[in-house]
Amino acid sequence: MNIFIGKLAIIFIFHHFLFLYCYFYYIISFTIEFSIFTNIMLLLTLVCIPLLGIVAIAPSYRTEAHRYITNLPANVDPDTHIKLIALVISIITFLYSLILLLLFDPTTPDYQFTFHLLNKHSHTFSSDFQIGVDGISIYFVVLTTFLFPISFLASWKISSSTTLNGNKYNVKFYLCTMLLLETLLILLFIVTDIMLFYIFFESVLIPLFLIVGIWGSSANRIRAAFLLFLFTLAGSLFMLLSILAIYYNVGSTDFQLIQQYSFDPSIQKILWAGIFISMAIKFPLWPLYSWLYRAHAEAPIAGSILLAGIVLKMATYGSLRVLLQFLPDASYYFSPLVQTMAIMSIIYASLATLRQTDFKALVAYSSIGHMGIIALGLFSNTIQGIEGSIILSIAHGFVSPALFILVGAVLYDRFHTRTIRYYRGVVTYMPIFSVFFFLFTIFNAGIPLSANWIGELLCLIGTFQFNPIVAVLAASGIVLSAAYSIWLYNRISFGTYSQYLNFTKDINRREFHLILPLLFLTILVGILPNTILDNIDVSVTTLLYQV
């Protein structure tokens, strides 16, 4: 009897053990499969969120019947609901990108969260939809998603225009164009196929052309939009020829396969020249800068924020991803040429800034100078220089949009003029604005403990290791940036209140919440730069020494 009970107990225990084993086996298997599935879909979901916003906004309409149905008061803009949809979608996209940043593993240089849609090659050409992020691209993605909610808030006052033949879909078209631009920029920074990189690099031009050309601030907006279009198109033709030549040699457009291929030095130089023309226009470097300040001067406030904060960074990312990674010998060979153009950009832009009478053009010229410093760091062929260029790109993505908000949204919305000589003594009636304006002007000049200072310092250290004379010349440009920054603040804020200005209120709650996160992040990165440097170090080191 005891033996029977013992056998029964053994069978019972074995049965439960087998049941628990099968249970945990299926649970673990499902968890692994689900984690693999979610890992694959993470980046694809990030791309789809702004597209869902377009789908939600596009079918909407605004009529008097809609006002009656929704019980909106006569003084309430019926476009508010679609503005809220766009704002919420952009905030969700930003929060989702932060989740990706938290899940990102900075200890490996490999692409993460990869997704590969197609793998079918034709006899003539092959290009697959492949996406992934590494330590370099993840921060450009986060910067992109961060600036779009700010852009939507900055342009909150935009309303449907009655000048375009009574067009009632103006705001809807504007919001859809902005969300499309966000989608294209995200795709640009996450694709791992050079042909797709080219497609999205050039596709960004379409919504930018519409934003500047339709919602620009004056009659010159059409000329500025076409100038932007023609400059970019001219550079893109050379870039396309180089990419086709890369495919002809490698037989693939995959980033990883191209990186493993060793090009002949003479071929590298030809390919490098074709791609660099497009990048030099996007930076922009001297003498290819004339489209930028015109586009900034005519663009709406959201267009200026995105141009300065993200679009110029396409050149930084493209130089890192294509020129330095795939064509390292040619990049080293042409480094003196790039540094000469960068020095000319820094000095010329700084001197031209001192002569400006339009404060949006002044901030635009200052962007040209800062992008010149970024180009110096990129082509210094040092870890410090490249990491400094990434930090300065991020810092410029905070400071320059903040300056455009302060002068292009706050001041221009109140006084309707961008001419600097009409402003004086603003601190008397706008003290909070003056504090923010002071902080960002000194940040723009590279004051210590700001993100700009960290980026400029690392760029100069890297450049000094490559060529001390070039570093000294670049430092003189930074001194000039301090000169025009202090002059601009002194001219607008101090002195007796200008007779050309009406008394007005200080910045409102919406404008305060626009500027505060930019201020916080600029100081945070300046005090704790290792929060970014530690995450990009492996990718930058691999990029520099693997080739």
Locate predicted features.
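Transmembrane helix-loop-helix hairpins at membrane boundaries of multipass inner-membrane proteins
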Residues: N2, G6, C22-L42, L52-C176
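Structural signature of hydrophobic alpha-helical transmembrane segments
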Residues: M41-I49, G135-T144, M195-P207, K269-I277, ...
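Alpha-helical transmembrane segments of multipass membrane proteins
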Residues: I54-A58, F152, I186-L187, L210-I211, ...
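C-terminal ends of transmembrane helices
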Residues: V55-N71, I150-T163, I211-S217, F283-R294, ...
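Alpha-helical multi-pass transmembrane bundles of energy-transducing inner-membrane proteins
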Residues: E64-H66, D77-I82, D110, F173-I267, ...
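Juxtamembrane/interfacial segments at transmembrane-helix boundaries in multi-pass membrane proteins
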Residues: D105-D128, T163, N220-R223, S236-S290, ...
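Short, amphipathic, aromatic/basic-enriched membrane-interface segments that mark the entry/exit
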Residues: W156-Y174, S331-P336, T357-V363, G425-T428, ...
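Predominantly late transmembrane helices and immediately cytosolic-facing juxtamembrane segments
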Residues: S400-F404, I469-F503
